[in-house]
Amino acid sequence: SRSGWSGERGFEIYSKDRNFDGVELWEYLLEKGSTAGLIASDISSMHTRRIEAGILDYGTDIDQTFNPYEIGLGRLVDKEKEDFIGREALVNTKRTALRLLGIKCEKTFLTRGDKLFEGAGSEAGFVSAGGWSPYLKYGVGLIRLNESRPTNYQLRISTSAGEFEGEVVQ
């Protein structure tokens, strides 16, 4: 399955057997997989992988205030379709630049709620989800901006460790 929260290949195991021992299966799989480098991980690794893959989480990254164009999903709107719920609103929606983008910071990890500032000091938005990417070797995050913007520019990120420069990416 690649439909999970992280976008990685994985498996889901279901059993109708009431006597099924999930712990026993878990220990067996870890033991047999250890020779191939299989290790257990926690939710934070899946969270970071989700951010790297750009998989959005409703309630964390997006909510009802966003339209499909602001989050990069405008290509999924079929304006030629005769009728569907919300059609009129979407047809009349001005296509704007994105309000939900990615950000990278080479100096520190990012956390939900870190504030974003423009050069002049005005608040530009906040980090909706963040972490450190061991694969990319820098801080990564999804950001919610106060207004639609293009990509490839710098913002200041105010974190618990101080203020750092971050590059806005798609």
Features from the language model and the residues they span:
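Glycine-rich, small/acidic residue-mixed loop/short-helix segments
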Residues: 66-170
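Glycine-rich, acidic
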Residues: 1-94, 98
